Structure formats: C-alpha cells, structure tokens
UniProtKB/Swiss-Prot annotation:
Organism in which the protein naturally occurs: Bacillus subtilis (strain 168)
Cystine pairs: none
Protein name: UPF0053 protein YugS
Principal localisation: membrane
Annotated transmembrane regions: 1-21, 61-81, 101-121, 133-153
Mode of membrane association: Multi-pass membrane protein
Organism phylogeny: Bacteria, Bacillati, Bacillota, Bacilli, Bacillales
Compartments, as annotated in UniProt: Cell membrane
Gene: yugS
CDD domains listed in its UniProt record: CBS_pair_CorC_HlyC_assoc (cd04590)
Gene Ontology MF annotations: flavin adenine dinucleotide binding
Length: 429
C-alpha cells in the first residue's frame, strides 16, 4: 500500500509538471510560428492554434490542473512520507513525541522540495526553452482536459470577475494587455544584452520608434544648400550644372528659391540632349509637392509614395522655401547614412574621435547631441546644433570656442552664419 501511495505522489508531481510546462509554453509560443506549422500540414499545430486563440480560457485550465494536483499532493504526500520515515527515525532512538515532530518536518520538506523542483522549476525552464515542442506535445491533452472541466473553469472565471467588480476593478484578459513603447524598448535592450538580436537590429528598431516622432524640418536639406536649376538656363547650361553637382533630381526655379516650379530628372535632360531634341526645360519638368516644414516624416513618406514623387519642397510659415526632403533622406532615418560612389569624400554626419568627443555636421539634431553626450540642451524653437550655437553667439567663425552645458564647442568650418562642422568635447562629468 505504501509503495502505491509513493507511486501516486510521483504521478501527481508529474501531472503538475505537465500543467506548469503547458502554462509557460502557450504563453511563450509565437502565433506566427504556429501558422507556419499549420501551412506545413502539422495537425498538432491546429490544436495549438486553438489554444493560443483562446489563451485566457486555457490558462485557467492549466491553473485549475495545477491547483487540483497540488491539493492531492498535499493530502497524500506528507502523510505517506511520514509513515515511510517514522520507522526509520524510531530505529535511531528518538523519543516518540519528538520522533513525530521530526518525521512531520522532514516529510514536509521532502514533499515541498519535490513539488517545487520537479513539479514547478524544472518544467518551467524546459517549456521556456522549448516552447514550440512543448506546445505541440501538450495541445491535444490540454484541450481534452479543458472540455472535461469546462463547467468548473467557467464557474471559477465568473466568480473571479464578480469578485474584482465588487472592488471597482474590471477583469482584463491576457490578450487585452497592451505593451507600451517604453516597455518594448526595455524588452529590446534586454534582448540585445542577451545576444538574441544583433547591434544592427537593435539600432533599426530604435530608429523606427524615433522615426514616428520626427518632423520634416529635422531631416531637410536647408534652403542654403539646395542645388537648383533656373528655368532660364538652356539645356546645355543645365547639363553642365548637373555634371558639377552630380545629383539625380533638381528643383527648377524662377528668379529665386522661393519660386520653385517643379523638378527635373537628370536622366530626362541627358536623353533629350543625346537625341538632339530642341526643347526647353519646362517641357521635361515634373510636378513637385509642397508641404509645411512641420509635417511628420511618416505622413510625408506616405504622400510621396502615393504620388510617386521622390522629392518634396518644405515651406515655412511665411510661405517661403525652407528646404527639401528626398525619399533617401527619410530612409536614412531608419537605416543610417546611404552613400553612393559620389559620396566617397563626404565627412560622416557624426564622427567619434574619442570618449565623449565628437565631430559633427552642423545639421546634427540637438536630440542626437543630448543622447551622445548625456547632456540636456533645451530649445523648442531650434532643431540643430548649428542653430543652437548661433543663439549663444551670432557672429561665429572657424576656430571660435563656446563653453556651455559642461561641454566645449569648437567651430571647425563656418561661413556667413552657416556652421558646417563643430567639434564637441564633454568637459564636466
């Protein structure tokens, strides 16, 4: 009889382990992976899909199974081990009153140890590491158990919902829990630290989060740096100009940059030139879209995709041209700098010279500088480090140094209030 009871104890521990493994596995498994297995014809995947589609109900089934086996183990385990150990401790000569206490304590420790280690911790570890295999293996038995205990599960869930409502709360299902952006960033950081994703993946996803908060003004090519073609130029003059500038698309202006009429693609100009066609620039000019400089980058990209236009002109609040944005500028916000064969000699946007020591393009965003140097430059009206430096001192030239925010800002290249490059060193730590 004692042997049968010991066997029953280990069976209960085994059943507990199955429910614990099932609980962690169905939470851990990815729905996309299950869908792939369904497409490959795995019948077990259909059962697993049914479970993760009704996750709350099946988690309740797991919890009910764990509770039932735990109660059975508590009812059978300690008395059985106590009867098994009592004769052994009697042989040691321990007086009977103390013998009973010692036997009870040791039996309780043994049952607790077996339950926690074999019934909880070990299956949890296995199911987290092998969530897919465990989910497929346990899916059909768990569905059978759910069907058998369905009335109890419904009664327990209903009672729990009624109880929490009495205290003014609402029951929330697992699939209704929303993860915030900050929580996603923390999960991403932990995955990167554990080596589950590489540095490029970590950087791309972070940039996607930041992308949603960007406005076009922050990534534009400013008005002063726009290479344009005048409508009055001949085809030959325009071609000579694009050979020097080496861009693909150019805004076409009339009189000045506040009057942009359209865009010309260099391919169209070369085609017309080599065919010997006597045409004017307005005949090969394409339409251009104009948007306010504060438009979110995401909205601008959608519009450019919809209208199949690669360049947009940004307009300031007074109606003048503020700058332009290309599709490449937008994509670079996610994937980083894109360089072609004509960009070989360009200085990187941000060049690290040492610890807390950088050389930056004047168009570098203040947010980027703050993140790199762990400082807090604040100016809601200014986007770039060059703009902020001009608020500190309007007449800046190459070689000038400004000390602010615990950093040294040295102007490396500037002309007519246009700061091209600045060297920044953090001096206060």
């Amino acid at each position: 009889m004692l042997i049968l009871q010991l066997i029953a104890i280990f069976v209960l521990i085994g059943i507990t382990a199955v429910f614990v493994a099932a609980e962690f596995a169905i939470v851990k498994i990815r729905g996309s992976k299950i869908n792939q297995l369904i497409e490959s014809g795995d019948s077990r995947a259909l059962a697993a899909h049914k479970i993760i589609s009704n996750l709350d109900e099946y988690l309740s089934a797991c919890q009910l199974g764990i509770t039932i086996t735990a109660l059975g183990l508590g009812w059978l385990g300690e008395p059985t081990f106590e009867r098994f150990l009592h004769p052994l401790f009697t042989m040691t000569g321990i007086p009977e009153p103390f013998n009973h206490i010692v036997t009870f304590v040791v039996a309780f420790i043994i049952v607790t140890f077996l339950h926690v280690v074999m019934g909880e911790l070990a299956p949890k570890t296995v199911s987290i590491q092998k969530a897919e295999a465990v989910s497929l293996w346990i899916a059909k038995p768990l569905i059978w158990f759910y069907k058998i205990t369905y009335p109890f599960i419904k009664a327990l869930n209903g009672s729990a919902s009624f109880l929490v409502k009495l205290f003014g709360f609402h029951s929330v299902k697992e699939h209704q829990v929303v993860i915030s952006e900050e929580e996603l960033r923390l999960i991403l950081s932990e995955s990167y630290e554990k080596g589950e994703i590489n540095q490029s993946e970590f950087r791309y996803v972070n940039k996607i989060f930041e992308f949603d908060n960007r406005v076009a003004r922050e990534i534009m090519i400013p008005r002063t740096e726009i290479a344009v073609i005048s409508l009055e130029q001949s085809l030959e003059e325009a071609i000579h100009h694009i050979i020097n500038e080496r861009y693909t698309r150019y805004p076409v202006i009339k009189d000045d940059k506040d009057h942009i009429l359209g865009i010309i693609n260099s391919k169209d100009m070369f085609k017309a030139y080599f065919l010997g066609q006597p045409i004017k620039l307005n005949q090969i000019m394409r339409p251009v879209i104009r948007v306010i400089e504060s438009i979110p980058v995401q909205q601008l990209l959608i519009r450019m995709q919809k209208e199949r236009i690669h360049m947009a002109i940004l307009v300031d609040e007074y109606g003048g041209t503020a700058g332009l944005v290309t599709v490449e500028d937008i994509i670079e916000e996610i994937v980083g700098e894109i360089r072609d064969e004509y960009d070989q000699d360009e200085t990187p946007h941000i060049l690290k010279k040492g610890e807390h020591h950088y050389v930056m393009d004047g168009k570098a965003l203040i947010d980027e500088v703050n993140d790199l140097l762990d400082i807090a430059i604040e100016n809601e009206e200014i986007d770039t480090i060059a703009g902020w430096l001009l608020t500190q001192k309007m007449e800046l030239k190459a070689g000038d140094v400004i000390h602010a925010e615990g950093c040294e800002f040295k102007i490396l290249d500037a002309e007519d209030h246009h700061i091209r490059f600045v060297e920044i060193k953090k001096t206060d730590f």
